[in-house]
Structure formats: C-alpha cells, structure tokens
Amino acid sequence: MASKLWQSTATGSLHPLVEAYTVGDDQVLDQHLLGHDITATKAHAHMLKKIGVLTSDEYQQLAAALDELLNEWKTGTFTLTSEHEDGHTAIELYLTEKLGPIGKKVHTGRSRNDQALVMMRLFIKAELEAVAEKLEAVAQAYAGKIATIGQTEMPGYTHTQKAMPTTVSMWLGSYHDAFHDLRQLVAHSIAAIDQNPLGSAAGFGVTLPLDRQMTTRELGFAKVQENPMYCGLSRGVFELIAVQALNPIMVFAGKFAEDMLLFTSQEFNYFKLPVTMTTGSSIMPHKRNYDVFEIMRATAHAYPNYTLQLQAISTGAGSGYHRDLQLTKKITMDAFTSALNTLEVLALCVSELEANTKRLAEAMTDELYTVAKINELVEKGVPFRDAYQQVKQSFLADSH
C-alpha cells in the first residue's frame, strides 16, 4: 500500500522539499494526538458494523487491532515515522498491514478532514476539562493560603502608591474569586464546541446511511454537528473559541506575577518563596531572583498571539477545507500547553507563599487611614467635602 492515502502509481512521488514543507511538524503533533484519532476510528468502525459495511467478525478484528495500537502508543512502542504523512495515514497503514483488506474498509464514509476535526475536537474537550481542574487547584491554593496568613494587614495600592488598608485575605481572595469564576467561562467554551463532526467527510457528507448519533454517543459529545459544511467552517474557529477562554486566565496569572515581583522586591519585602523556587546570579552571590514570576508575566503578555494567529488563519480561509488550517493545530496545542503549565506553577507558588508579617506591619503607615478619618467626621455631621479638606490639610501639614 502507498505510504500516502491519496497516492497512486500514476502520481509518482512527491518532491521531498515540498513534502517536508507541507507536512511540517505534523508527525510530532499527531504523535501526541494519536490516542484521540484511534478512539474516533474505533467508534467509526463500530458504526460501520451497525450499517452493514463491516461484518461482526471484521469489526471485532479491527477493534482488537485498534486496541493493540492504542496500547502500543501509550507505552511508546508505536511512533510515527517519515513514511507516515500524518497520524491518520499511520492508523490505516497499521490496520492494512495487520488485517489486509479488512483494514482498507475502515476509511469508508470518512475523510481525513472529519478525521482531523474529530481528533482535535476530542483533544480540545479534554484540554478544557484539564484547565477546569487546574483552575480549581489554583483556587484551592489561594483558599489554603488565606486560611494561614489571611488575617495579616497589608497596604492597598492604587497607581502603585499606598491607598487604603486591606488584608492579605482580601488581596489573595480577589485572585481566588477570579480563578474560581473562570471555570464558568471554560464550561461555556466546552458547551460551544461539544459537537461531533465525524461523518461530515470532506465537508459535504456522504451517500451512505451513517449513524452519526451513534458515534456522538460513543465519543461522548453533547450533539451532532449537523451541517457538514459547518463542520469544516468551524475548523480553526472552535479552536479560537477554546483558546479565547484561556486569555483571561493568563491575564490574572500575569497580574499576580506582577504583584509578586513588586511585593518580593527588597524595597517592599512583604512576601517570599522558598529558596528552592528562586534562582541566583552568576556574578552577584547575594541575589534571589523570582524568575518564575518574570517568565509567568512574559508568558501572559505574549499569550494573545495565539488567538491573533488563530483568528487570522481562520479568517483568511473561506468555506470548505484549505490546507492553511493545518497550522491551527500547533497553535492550539501550544496555547493549551502554555496555559496548563502556568496554572500548575501558579498553584505551587501560591501554596508556598510566605508572608513577612513584621515588614507588613511596618508598612501600615498613617496615610492609609485618611479615608477612615474622613468617615469619622462624616458620622459627626460634617459634610463629606469639608471633612475631606480638613483631613487633607492636616495630612499635608504633618507631612511637612
């Protein structure tokens, strides 16, 4: 069998430079995604048995071979090679080499278009669910730290200047609430993309009586993505929806990183991490550098590039399939890797956070209480603006 599903003796071999350029790093990416591709292939084969394309014995052989392939993939004994154009090709070649003509039947009623769509859809669902779990872990880390150091007073800041008194609990609690709430955004994204594209084939459906409801149930999707052209139209866009849900997560992670870089500086010295979580200098032996927060801040700043790339590529491709969309795979995978790694590190940093209660107490200086003094005068019947001016004049006089 030819190493490419579309190849024949009449077409000859693809120029190696063109092949390398068009395939790109698909083999590396598909190696990671192969489990989802195998799962969807098994569901498709089961459906083919139901509609009579496969006999019961043929399906059993295919299912056993797919289970064997899945196990080989999980244990690392099956890897994609240069002879595989992509993971879809690798699966069919594996089945054909193992089962002969039976393996050649597995692609009936299916295109690599919907095969790639369902593989990525399963991946995105799983990754969003993993993000939701990480968000809960981060929220719990904040809650745990609030329970131990939350009652400590600290200055609140506006314009990076001391403003009003607050507590560590209120500061950390704001991040707890943020990450807790973002689980709802992730849930909405899952609901939006939880549609089964398998059976749309090349984007126009097929004349076979495919049971798409059956594969929807077997793969755990909420519903069938009915219009086959919409299946193709949503490629890249559903990825965009998912990655956009990660943007606010990275915004809050970046904000916390910025807070920590300020509050751990020697000038503030409010908080610290264990020495095992900081780095040093090759020339200055006294340095304790919070590289982890600098990388987190930079990662958060760069993160919108993922959504910009997905939107640009998806917008530039009209309806129907275009090879441009292949590039959305790596962007999406990298976006999830970045967000999940950030959340994992963030949970660790929060759980290991230590407060310098002595320094925080010293920082609770008189100017933080000016609004409280105004309110005391207001409660005595002084109009607010008059009370404001009295307190301001008194503060300015004392500061000179």
Residue ranges and their predicted role:
Residues 219-307:
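Acidic, glycine-rich loop-and-beta core segments that form the ion-binding/anion-interacting portion
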Residues 53-54, 221, 382:
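Helix N-cap/coil-helix junction residues
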Residues 14, 144, 148, 152, ...:
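Acidic-glycine-rich active-site phosphate/pyrophosphate-binding loop
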Residues 44, 65-72, 94, 98, ...:
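Generic, well-ordered alpha-helical scaffold segments in large soluble proteins
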Residues 2-40, 98-102, 284-400:
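Glycine-rich cofactor/substrate-binding loops
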Residues 125-132, 136, 143, 169, ...:
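Short amphipathic alpha-helical segments with heptad-repeat character
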Residues 1-205, 210-216, 276-281, 291-295, ...:
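A helix-coil-helix interface module used to build multimeric assemblies
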Residues 143, 147-150, 187, 191-194, ...:
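Alpha-helical coiled-coil oligomerization motifs
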